[in-house]
């Protein structure tokens, strides 16, 4: 065995959804934009993504982020989100977690007011987080996400075993195909995870056949990666319960941050909620919740959009210094799906 590389990471979870924060060891090109940094990672460090997200260090539902230096004084840090298969434009549960981890671990200076503001550069755009802290405790994160909008409504498709359904295509930092399950027998619960994953991948392929995906102002954003199933909540006070299926069939354990943003845009477009109306979202596990609110409207090019905020909390799980032997194909990472 020959140790070739050592990388330091922080592990967190946000209402059960994991995050591996990779904060050292990558020599990003000086002055590069966040898109240039992602291209640099894809070309030179994709092996690191695979090694940390996949087995034996990770698992099929692992999620992570490269915490990068800012590209300009307009930002405090950059975020490039990853999983075992690919890259994501944004992640809300991850933003909640990485912001809290930065404050808790001294990676950003604490504001004496007890509310520290962090400006993140993502490949979806600017995301501004506020982290509340008191003494040595970090309490919660609220972030204003990129603007959200509904791109298409009532996309008809067939879901095997559950009949004809309709989906809305919504942008909330990632593109989501949002599907109402209330008229079906499929329930959102951990014990139904395999079926939810399987149906989510089928639904995504069906929706992809019906729509062309293109962000109004960001030419590089043109893919549907997430499917969201939702139905009535099981926690009192929540507007809905949902699960987000993405990548190779991963299930988001949390209520979802970009997902909550997309869901608020979805419900606002259908007249269920209004601007400045707080909502609470419930995730797969039926335990944790996020708080959301649409604080205004804006435009993306000529398209009307809304401004979502999401609030949640994350827990610190631990740290690790990983040694990686790239000559060992098992050590380099593998997936069992």
UniProtKB/Swiss-Prot annotation:
Family named by the database record: Belongs to the proline racemase family.
Isomerase recorded as keyword: yes
InterPro entries, per database record: Pro_racemase_fam (IPR008794)
GO function terms (MF aspect): 4-hydroxyproline epimerase activity
Xref: PANTHER family: BIFUNCTIONAL TRANS-3-HYDROXY-L-PROLINE DEHYDRATASE_2-EPIMERASE, TRANS-3-HYDROXY-L-PROLINE DEHYDRATASE
Disulfide bridges in this chain: none
Active-site residues from the entry: 91 (proton acceptor)
Protein name: 4-hydroxyproline 2-epimerase
Keywords: Isomerase
Species this protein is from: Cereibacter sphaeroides (strain ATCC 17029 / ATH 2.4.9) (Rhodobacter sphaeroides)
Record's function text: Catalyzes the epimerization of trans-4-hydroxy-L-proline (t4LHyp) to cis-4-hydroxy-D-proline (c4DHyp). Is likely involved in a degradation pathway that converts t4LHyp to alpha-ketoglutarate. Displays no proline racemase activity.
Top-level taxon of origin: Bacteria
Binding of substrate, residues: 92-93, 252, 257-258
UniProt EC number: 5.1.1.8
Catalysed reactions listed for this entry: trans-4-hydroxy-L-proline = cis-4-hydroxy-D-proline
């Amino acid at each position: 065995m020959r140790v070739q590389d050592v990388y330091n990471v922080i592990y967190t979870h946000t209402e059960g959804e994991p995050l591996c924060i990779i904060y050292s060891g990558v020599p990003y090109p000086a002055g590069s934009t966040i898109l240039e940094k992602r291209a640099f990672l894809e070309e030179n460090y994709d092996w690191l993504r695979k090694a940390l997200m996949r087995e034996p260090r990770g698992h099929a539902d692992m999620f992570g982020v490269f915490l990068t230096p800012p590209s300009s004084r307009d930002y405090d840090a950059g975020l490039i989100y990853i999983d075992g298969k690919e890259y994501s434009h944004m992640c809300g549960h991850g933003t909640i977690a990485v912001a809290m981890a930065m404050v808790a671990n001294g990676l950003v200076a604490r504001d004496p007011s007890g509310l520290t503001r962090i400006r993140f550069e993502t490949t979806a755009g600017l995301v501004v987080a506020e982290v509340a802290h008191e003494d040595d405790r970090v309490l919660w994160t609220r972030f204003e996400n990129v603007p959200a909008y509904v791109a298409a409504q009532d996309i008809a498709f067939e879901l095997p075993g559950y009949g004809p359904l309709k989906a809305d295509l919504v942008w909330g930092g990632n593109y989501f195909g949002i599907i109402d399950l209330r008229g079906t027998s499929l329930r959102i619960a951990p014990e139904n995870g395999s079926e939810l994953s399987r149906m989510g991948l089928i639904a995504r392929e069906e929706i992809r056949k019906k729509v062309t995906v293109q962000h109004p102002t960001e030419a590089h954003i043109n893919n549907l990666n997430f499917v969201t199933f939702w139905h009535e909540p099981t926690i009192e006070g929540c507007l809905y319960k949902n699960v987000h299926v993405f990548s190779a069939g991963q299930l988001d354990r949390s209520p979802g941050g970009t997902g909550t943003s997309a869901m608020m845009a979805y419900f606002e477009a259908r007249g269920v909620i209004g601007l400045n109306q707080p909502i609470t979202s419930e995730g797969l596990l039926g335990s944790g919740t996020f708080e959301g609110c649409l604080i205004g409207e804006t435009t993306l090019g000529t398209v009307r959009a809304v401004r979502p905020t999401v609030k949640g909390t994350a827990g610190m799980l631990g740290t690790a210094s990983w040694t990686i032997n790239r000559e060992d194909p098992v050590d380099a990472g593998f997936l069992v799906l």
